[in-house]
Amino acid sequence: MNIQRKELLVTSFALFSLFFGAGNLLLPPLLGYNAGENWFWVTIGFMITAVVIPIIGILAHARLQGTLFDFGKKVSPIFSLIYCIVIYIIAVAIPSPRTAAATHEIAIHSAFGTSPSLTSAIYFSLVLVFVLNRSKILNLIGKFLTPFIVIMLLAVIGIGLSSSAFTTGISQIETPIVTGILEGYQTFDAIGAVVVGAVIIVSLNFKNMKVEAFESKRKLIRRSGFIAGTGLFIIYAGLISVGAYYGSEIEVNSELSSDMQRANLLRGISIASLGEFGNTVLSILISLACFTTAIGIVAGTADYFKGLLKDSQTVYVVTAIIACVLGVVVGQLDFKSIITVAIPVLLLIYPITIVLILLNVMPEKLATPLIFRAVIISTILFSIPDFLGAIELREFVEPFVEVIPFAKYSLGWVLPAFLTFVVSSIVQLKITRDR
């Protein structure tokens, strides 16, 4: 295998693994189970926010080859600075601790009966060790951890599908595509794209690619994004279909929280597919998937603040330690509590992130500061009702929900953002033509 192909595979595997965390493994099977006969349409919706948008985010990184700051600087440097800080605080305060909580509840507690504090402390100590060995992250994840994760996932999906009766239950979901889109929010993959994309770029620079031609790195990152996206598509579609076809044979206690329903369903599928060994496989899978994601989040956060403060290695180390300590503290909460906090935040920050990703892959003439500012302002304004509704202030936003298209599906920002983009593009073209 030549060096370029090897580099492509390692980068693709690392990118896949940095994306694939707790939610990515737990969400799809229960989504398929609830969708039943409509599992295909749920899959389409899920792929939009969990695969397509994140991979477009990687393409934007390939184009910019900078930091997360570059995503929003056309709105204004102040906006971009605030956006970056908010994104990284969210990343280390919600999805990173969530990986520890999921590892404890599903993999560790059932086997060893340890306390959440002990699990989180050991977990983030190991994360810190990997993050402090910054130059080796890409190889450690891409060469060793990811292939193991992918092989085990394909085994569970393949055996599960081959032994199922290919019958589904009646769908419990009224709007499958919309439900899939909103479930895709909970993977955090769009936010993950802007965070881990920067991790990949810094990692490539560590591997002596800093002097490589801009176009060479862009090609490598783009190809890696497509390969990782294809892998995510196959795994997600497989997990959703297994949940739909095989899940009907497994009893899911409706009185449990949705998070424990997800865990129990996946455990049931694993055991039914692989026997008692399936429980061990699931525990290892979740632990590794969560671990690699936590490494990416902490490393990405430390990279950003290091670059922000004159490339200081001390800042990198201190930021990594703070992120890991925060992970230990928040990681002691149960998975459900973390998700409850995450949903309102996601409904506000996710639309902004999606719009920034899409604008950054537009042709230059359609990605001017005027267009950026107009579309982002529109997106923020029309995301506020979704945020307020999620924090039990629904009565204040009910009049807006009744008027704004798609607002009842928590997608009220979509049409205003699109119309603002069209109008501002026309205005921009007119300004350009008049000069």
Please annotate each region the language model reported:
Residues 5-15, 40, 76-89, 118-122, ...:
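Select transmembrane alpha-helical segments in multipass membrane proteins
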Residues 10-20, 157-164, 173-242, 281-290, ...:
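Hydrophobic, membrane-embedded alpha-helices of multi-pass small-molecule transporters
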Residues 31, 99-116, 205, 294-321:
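Helix-loop-helix connectors at the membrane interface of multi-pass transporters/channels
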Residues 35-125:
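Membrane helical hairpin/interfacial module
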Residues 62-69, 124-145, 206-209, 328-340, ...:
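Membrane-water interface regions at transmembrane-helix termini and the short interhelical loops
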Residues 132-160, 342-354, 373-381:
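Membrane-interface loop-to-helix entry segments
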Residues 230-264:
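Extracellular/periplasmic helix-exit of transmembrane alpha-helices
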Residues 354-422, 433-435:
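C-terminal membrane-solvent junction of multi-pass transporters and transport-like membrane proteins
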